[in-house]
Amino acid sequence: MKKVFISGGGTGGHFYPALSVAENLKEKGFSITYIGTTNGIENKKDFPADEKILYPMRAVRGKSIVGKIQGVFSLLSTTFKVYKQIKKEKPDFSICFGGYTSIPLGLASFLARVPLYIHEQNSIPSYSNKILSYFAKKVFITFELTAKYFDRKKTVLTGMPLRKNIIERAKNYVYKPNQTKTVLVVGGSQGAKKLSESIISLASEMKDIKFILIKGKWQVEVPNLENLTVYEYVDNMEDLYTSADVVISRSGSSSVNEILCFGKYAIFVPFPYAASNHQYYNVKWLKDLGLCELIEEKDLSKEVLKKALEDAFNKDLESLSKKIKEYAIFDSDEKIVENILNDFKND
């Protein structure tokens, strides 16, 4: 049986694209070994792998000197453990989806001379993917502008692998304006307290608009308003996307690409502490095309959001939806898998 090693975890931004590609490979008859960390989302979520191996890894970025040393040591020691596993199982290739948890599999694959492929989710690549790109056979990118950070001969624009239920619902979805204006607010996995508080305040003023707020982990005081529905987290995002006229969201890669797939006009508020400010650049290109609004956290207020919403509802959202959807890539997982399998056909 054909075998592949996959790594991508720590957070959902790395985990879910890896899961999407793994499901595709399973359908094609591959045996999958997943490499992750005991400290990440992968320790709580199922993954379509025949074997799931989790190691106690530590991050390096943003830590103290002692923390960095501990992080480097944990990644190097894990690299040698993964190397032994690779020599034992002899995979045909490995795929890494970024984040510090990918470094051991990437380095071990290089040392064991196993073909390595990586996928970069964000506009500005992570340090781990920058390092691993030197050893990779191909670098799959989500945004066209990311190619300049890698060897262009290696880069392939594939888009962002998304969950099946999102893709299946979005493919044939056509936006039609709601009778009652509806705004979906997505705080992202880390939440957005300031954004949530601004929306709650705004909902009490703009009573002709229905607000659906996914607030994340933050504790905020929620008044009893008929036009405001609040969730901490939801699994059925596809239902909420289809019910909205406008989306207000953080701009992590998964959220951005889901919004593109549903063709939603969005007001993006990038998470200001994202590495290299990548959330800002994930949507700057879309703003330059006039297909979204972009508000930096430092400029965020109830008044600014109110003005942005009023401007949004004065636009031809139906026409904009068609233009936005043109930038969606619905078969990202298949593009990645096809590119890899074609390499083996041509070798």
Curated annotation (Swiss-Prot):
Signal peptide segment: none
Coiled-coil features, chain-numbered ranges: none
Subcellular location: Cell inner membrane
Main location: membrane
MF-aspect GO terms: UDP-N-acetyl-D-glucosamine:N-acetylmuramoyl-L-alanyl-D-glutamyl-meso-2,6-diaminopimelyl-D-alanyl-D-alanine-diphosphoundecaprenol 4-beta-N-acetylglucosaminlytransferase activity; undecaprenyldiphospho-muramoylpentapeptide beta-N-acetylglucosaminyltransferase activity
Catalytic activities: di-trans,octa-cis-undecaprenyl diphospho-N-acetyl-alpha-D-muramoyl-L-alanyl-D-glutamyl-meso-2,6-diaminopimeloyl-D-alanyl-D-alanine + UDP-N-acetyl-alpha-D-glucosamine = di-trans,octa-cis-undecaprenyl diphospho-[N-acetyl-alpha-D-glucosaminyl-(1->4)]-N-acetyl-alpha-D-muramoyl-L-alanyl-D-glutamyl-meso-2,6-diaminopimeloyl-D-alanyl-D-alanine + UDP + H(+)
Keywords carried by this UniProt record: Cell cycle, Cell division, Cell inner membrane, Cell membrane, Cell shape, Cell wall biogenesis/degradation, Glycosyltransferase, Membrane, Peptidoglycan synthesis, Transferase
Pathway(s): Cell wall biogenesis; peptidoglycan biosynthesis
EC top class, as a word: transferase
UniProt key word Chloroplast: no
EC number(s) stated in the UniProt entry for this protein: 2.4.1.227
Positions that bind UDP-N-acetyl-alpha-D-glucosamine: T11, G12, G13, N122, R163, S189, Q279
GO cellular component, one term: plasma membrane
Membrane topology per record: Peripheral membrane protein
One BP annotation, GO: cell wall organization
Reported function: Cell wall formation. Catalyzes the transfer of a GlcNAc subunit on undecaprenyl-pyrophosphoryl-MurNAc-pentapeptide (lipid intermediate I) to form undecaprenyl-pyrophosphoryl-MurNAc-(pentapeptide)GlcNAc (lipid intermediate II).
Family as reported in the entry's similarity comment: Belongs to the glycosyltransferase 28 family. MurG subfamily.
PANTHER family hit by this protein: GLYCOSYLTRANSFERASE, UDP-N-ACETYLGLUCOSAMINE--N-ACETYLMURAMYL-(PENTAPEPTIDE) PYROPHOSPHORYL-UNDECAPRENOL N-ACETYLGLUCOSAMINE TRANSFERASE 1
UniProt-listed NCBIfam families: murG
UniProt name for this protein: UDP-N-acetylglucosamine--N-acetylmuramyl-(pentapeptide) pyrophosphoryl-undecaprenol N-acetylglucosamine transferase
Gene that specifies this protein: murG
